[in-house]
Amino acid sequence: MNLKDLIKLLEVKFPQIDSNEVESKITIYKNYLQQENKIHNLTRLDKEEEIYQKYFYESILNFHNDLFDNKNINLLDIGSGSGVPGIFLKILFPHINLYIVESNTKKVNFLNNLVDKLELENVFISNQRCEDYIKDKIEFFDLITCRAVAELRILLELSFPGLKINGIGFFLKSNNYLVELDNAKNISSKLKIEEEPKIETIEYDGKTFVSLKYIKKNKVNNIFPRTWKEILNNDKN
């Protein structure tokens, strides 16, 4: 995939985007990622065509316009790493207020520099562990997402306290999602998650991309999220 291919796919998926602006920012992002990746090993993807397809496009494959209808949306990306999907979503949807929590200081430094280079506004990056960060952001977010960070049972505990009522938890998963759903039953009950998530699977380039969409309907007990040690030691079932 080249840059023009990527832009065409994005125009089909998100027809409202400013293609010229998006193309310009993707180029800046890609060049800076490649430059810094030689020093800091931010991603295993270094070939241009892989970055356009696997790094950018596949990171937002499961997202849809309706997730971003709110014109004053607070979006949290947990463990954004080198910026996907969070920074890329901000490029596509400039109106969002983007919050990123990332515990890796090297990656936080990269993200801060990237935001400056892209001249993005209303991006707030915190160098913290998520379980500590969320304690100060109870019922603050309209949408919380993450990609390949932790098992679902952990993500639910980290995210649900931070969601507003009717807020959305949108988690990108692998083919192992059924096992993760089963392992998350106990914590789902404790978090008063009554509805099953909406599951979407997309087949692309011989791979299956899965998203789990939860809607928060009930307040969460203020004991959550617990400490990381307590979360890890908690029985899955």
UniProtKB/Swiss-Prot annotation:
| Protein family (similarity comment) | Belongs to the methyltransferase superfamily. RNA methyltransferase RsmG family.
Q: Fetch the PANTHER family from UniProt.
A: S-ADENOSYL-L-METHIONINE-DEPENDENT METHYLTRANSFERASES SUPERFAMILY PROTEIN (PTHR31760:SF0)
Task: Please tell me which top-level EC class this enzyme sits in.
Answer: transferase
Q: Where is this protein found?
A: Cytoplasm
Residues bound to S-adenosyl-L-methionine are: 79, 130-131, 147
One Gene Ontology MF term: rRNA (guanine-N7-)-methyltransferase activity
Any one GO CC term of this protein is:
cytosol
Q: What are the protein's UniProt keywords?
A: Cytoplasm, Methyltransferase, rRNA processing, S-adenosyl-L-methionine, Transferase
This protein is called Ribosomal RNA small subunit methyltransferase G
User: Where does the record locate the signal sequence feature?
Assistant: none
E.C. number(s) listed in UniProt: 2.1.1.-
Q: NCBIfam families from the entry?
A: rsmG_gidB
Its gene name is rsmG
Record's function text? Specifically methylates the N7 position of a guanine in 16S rRNA.
- Record's InterPro entries? rRNA_ssu_MeTfrase_G, SAM-dependent_MTases_sf
